[in-house]
Amino acid sequence: QLNGETVYTACETNVFSLFSLLPGTPYTVAVQAEGETLTLDFTTEAETFFVDASRYGLVADGETDNTGRLQAALSTCPRGGTVYVPAGRYRTASLFMKSCTTLYLEKGAVLLGDNDRTHYPILPGVIPSENEVDEYYLTGWEGNPLDSFAGLLNITQVHDVVVTGEGTLDCDAQNGDWWVNPKVKRIAWRPRAVAAVDSENVCLHGITVQNSFSWTIHPIFVKHLDLLNFNINNPYNAPNTDGIDPESCEYIRIIGMNIHVGDDCIAMKASKVFLGMKLKRSCEHTVIRNCLLDKGHGGIVIGSEMSGGVKDMVVTQCLMDHTDRGLRVKTRRGRGNTAVIDGLVFRNVEMRGVKAPFVINMFYFCDPDGHGPYVQCREAMPVDEYTPKLGSLTMENIVATDAQFAGCYFDGLPEQPIERVTMKNVTITFDPNAKEGQAAMADNRPLVKKLAIYAENVKNIKLHNVKIEGYEGERLRFANVGHFEED
């Protein structure tokens, strides 16, 4: 109830949104469940000005180019103001937010991406300074600072920005050439649906983002990032259309998301070796909870672009439904000694039909040299400045049903084994009709089916109340595992 009026009944989720609230107004929310009532009093933030974008001459026919009109509304919005976009279909190319403003997309409002790539500005990957020493990184492609088209919505070097409402950002990529030969650079690399760079206090909430050109939500060097209770929808066969890819960001909250994509649902990143080792900016202090992760390649993924490191991440109360892998860590030699993954906790997670629930792969065959001997050699190589490291991973209170390939597949480097894997109260059940497949994307690894727990090159493994049902062969298949404990 909101101020005594019922707004939701029979809710199946415990993250929900309230829209069309008045600014600077006190409210009381009451939630009733199982005979108990909880209340919360709050006051909405004040608003300086309400800017109706339709007054800027918008044409809502889905064909007319509205880029200039929409950008005029965003650029002239006063500090603390809201740009309101009413229902309608508005064709547009790249838009840029400014600090201390809100973009509100009304229900039925659709910002529809321009299908002509020549209408999108190109953002330089690197801008040199006058002293020719410092550099400014404006965009990137798969972990490197390469020239790319600006996104449909850009949040660049700003602060205190909110994008909210029940409207839609539709890149309309299926009707352009964005998914044709996706690995080929044409003029510049593909844009993102929402690109945020070098910004602080950024919040996306409530909206739907769909049919992205490539990665959907791609924040780089963003501090205090909230992604709250909105939808990401991309076709399963759409190439490289990850859902959320925070890169070298800090203090991230990803809560109540519904993600249906053609690649990884959420992938935590920290650049490739050039930027990772130069800037040493990790992705850290992340909370992911109450999210639905549906039919992507991976549910929660770390890497493979992670040369700056990924640390201090907690994932809880999430549902992964028919993703290829559940928890997926992917790295390789060459990411650098700054590529440290540590302090990852996964708890209270359910997986349904996930083919390989837990995969740690330090032989991931990405990049042009990914199949070469340096990456794929199974013999120990010298530990040097290019050797990545995996620290502590904890998984507890997890149920995975209808797995197929492998329940747990942990493949560390012989020269730098995985430091510690702890599993507590974990149950994995295999699909009786499971088909064999590749648990981890590495060379010279056999196809597997109903493989319970495989571990190679791991220093410490601790299992407490870990149940595997319906597996074939040995329950534990270990090679070069140091200390093992099970109770």
Feature locations, PLM:
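Extracellular/periplasmic carbohydrate-active domains that bind, remodel
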Residues: 1-487
